[in-house]
A protein has these predicted regions:
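A generic local secondary-structure boundary/capping motif
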Residues: 6-9, 123-126, 155-159, 175-180
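A generic, well-ordered mixed alpha/beta core segment in the N-terminal half of proteins
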Residues: 96-147, 151-159
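Conserved "HGTGT" condensation-loop signature of ketosynthase/thiolase-family condensing enzymes
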Residues: 1-106, 168-178, 187-309
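Conserved small/polar residues in nucleotide/adenosyl-binding loops
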Residues: 160-165
Length: 309
C-alpha cells in the first residue's frame, strides 16, 4: 500500500482518498440565504422539533450523517469511524449524535477548522488502511453558541433587578460591523480510500498565529494570520502558486478577515484573486444582517457539502 509522503507541514496523499458522498443541513437563516437551493435539508424551525438549542444541534449533525449515508447507499453498520466536532463544550452535540448513530467515534475540537481537520485526518487514516468507510462532520448552532460563549444571559437565564418587585432585564448590545453570524448548519462527508468522488490530494496542518487580537467581535482578524500562514506553507511545500487553482476557499474569515488575508499574502508576494470565503457566500450580508458574514464549524461544512461538492 502506498505511503503518505510528508513534505514540510503538508501530507501528500498517494492514492487520493475520495469524498464519496456529502450532505448539508441548515436552519431558518440558511434557508433564506443565496445557497438555500444547494442544501439537502432545511428547516424554518431552528429547534428542529427538539427541546433545546443544544439538542437541535445534535439533530443537525445526526441528520446530516444519515442523509450522507443514504446518498451513498451505505448501511451505517459499515462505517468504521466518525470524526466529528461542534462548538459546544466537550463536543456535546457530536457525542449525543454519535450515541444515536452507533458507530466508532473520535471527537474533534478545532472550532471553525473542524471540518478541514476531519477531512485531513480522515484522508490520512483511509490511505493508511485504518478505515474503508469514514465520516467527517461538523456542526454549529447560532443560539447554542450564543448561549455558551457570547450572551448567556440573553439565551440562557434571566438577570433580575433588585429589590422587589424584580424585573427581568434583556441583553441589548449592538452587533458590531466586524461581528459574524454563527451558522445553524451541519455538513457530513463520507471518505473512502479510493473510488468515485472528489479526491483529497494533500493536507496542510496550520500553526497557531497570535497577533494579540482581543476584540471578541472581530474573529476574522484573529483568524486571518493563521489562514495566511497555512496557505504560505502549502504553496511552499507543494511548489504551487495561487493562480494554478480554480478557486481557493477559506472557512469563515468573513469580509474583514478575507481582506486581511489578501493583504497578508500580498505582503509576501502572493495575490489570491481566486479566493472565496464560505462565510461570505452562505448569507447575503446586505439582506440578512449578518455583518461581516457567517461563521462556525457548520459554516464551511455545509458550504462544502452543499455548494462545493
Amino acid at each position: 500500500m502506498p505511503m503518505t509522503v510528508r513534505c514540510g507541514d503538508t501530507l501528500l496523499f498517494q492514492t487520493l482518498p475520495v469524498i464519496a458522498a456529502g450532505a448539508a443541513v441548515g436552519g431558518k437563516k440558511e434557508s433564506e440565504g443565496p445557497l438555500a437551493a444547494e442544501f439537502d435539508e432545511l428547516s424554518a424551525d431552528n429547534r428542529f422539533g427538539q427541546s433545546s438549542w443544544e439538542a437541535a444541534e445534535k439533530y443537525l449533525q445526526l441528520r446530516a450523517a444519515r442523509l450522507c449515508l443514504q446518498k451513498a447507499a451505505l448501511p451505517q453498520e459499515k462505517v468504521q469511524l466518525a470524526l466529528a466536532g461542534d462548538l459546544q463544550a466537550q463536543c456535546t452535540a457530536s457525542s449525543y449524535a454519535m450515541r444515536e448513530l452507533g458507530v466508532p467515534f473520535a471527537g474533534l475540537f478545532g472550532a471553525c477548522s473542524t471540518m478541514a481537520e476531519g477531512l485531513a485526518l480522515g484522508a490520512a487514516l483511509c490511505e493508511g488502511g485504518a478505515a474503508r468507510n469514514l465520516l467527517a462532520m461538523a456542526s454549529s448552532h447560532f443560539c447554542a453558541a450564543e448561549r455558551q460563549f457570547r450572551t448567556p444571559l440573553s439565551y440562557g437565564c434571566l438577570l433580575y433587578t433588585s429589590p422587589s418587585p424584580r424585573t427581568p432585564l434583556s441583553y441589548g448590545a449592538v452587533r458590531t460591523p466586524t461581528a459574524q453570524w454563527t451558522a445553524t448548519a451541519a455538513g457530513c462527508c463520507l471518505l473512502q480510500p479510493q473510488g468515485e468522488g472528489v479526491g483529497i490530494a494533500a493536507a496542510t496542518f496550520g500553526r497557531v498565529q497570535d497577533y494579540q487580537v482581543k476584540d471578541i467581535n472581530n474573529m476574522g482578524a484573529a483568524m486571518a494570520p493563521a489562514a495566511a500562514s497555512t496557505l504560505l506553507h502549502y504553496f511552499k511545500d507543494t511548489g504551487t502558486e495561487p493562480q494554478e487553482f480554480d478557486c481557493i476557499y477559506t472557512g469563515d474569515l468573513g469580509q474583514v478577515g478575507s481582506q486581511l488575508l489578501r493583504e497578508l499574502l500580498a505582503a509576501e508576494g502572493l495575490l489570491i484573486k481566486n479566493h472565496v470565503d464560505c462565510g461570505c457566500i452562505l448569507f447575503d450580508a446586505n439582506e440578512q444582517s449578518v455583518k461581516s458574514g457567517g461563521s462556525g464549524p457548520g459554516c464551511c461544512a455545509a458550504v462544502l457539502c452543499g455548494h462545493i461538492l
